[in-house]
Amino acid sequence: MSTSITLEGFYRKAGMLIPWFMSAALVLFIVGVYLGFFVCPIEARQGNSYRIIFIHIPAAWLAMSLYLLMAVASIVGLLKNSRLAFILAQAMAPTGALMGFIALFSGAFWGRPTWGTYWVW
């Protein structure tokens, strides 16, 4: 009895789950944006510029998490000689790069009103 997942089986199961995950992500995104930008009070020292943090921190965490998962998937792919692990690692790369880009520039846009400069390092 084999416990490995074939590519065809993975694509079939992933295809069935995509609409559910996309719906949940959209609902959570809308709720998060509403709470972060309209419900939270104005911060005493930073004013409204602190609201950028509601985009910056999740993007940075997601980028780091995706890069860690890419490394794990690549190691699994090397150890188990699994094409699926390499496909998963390759699929995570564009999203990790996008989240890294968002984190980098949202941090700069937060730094400008907070520190008076886009970059401190």
State the predicted function of each range.
Residues S2-F10, G15-E43, G47-W121:
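Hydrophobic cores of alpha-helical transmembrane segments in multi-pass integral membrane proteins
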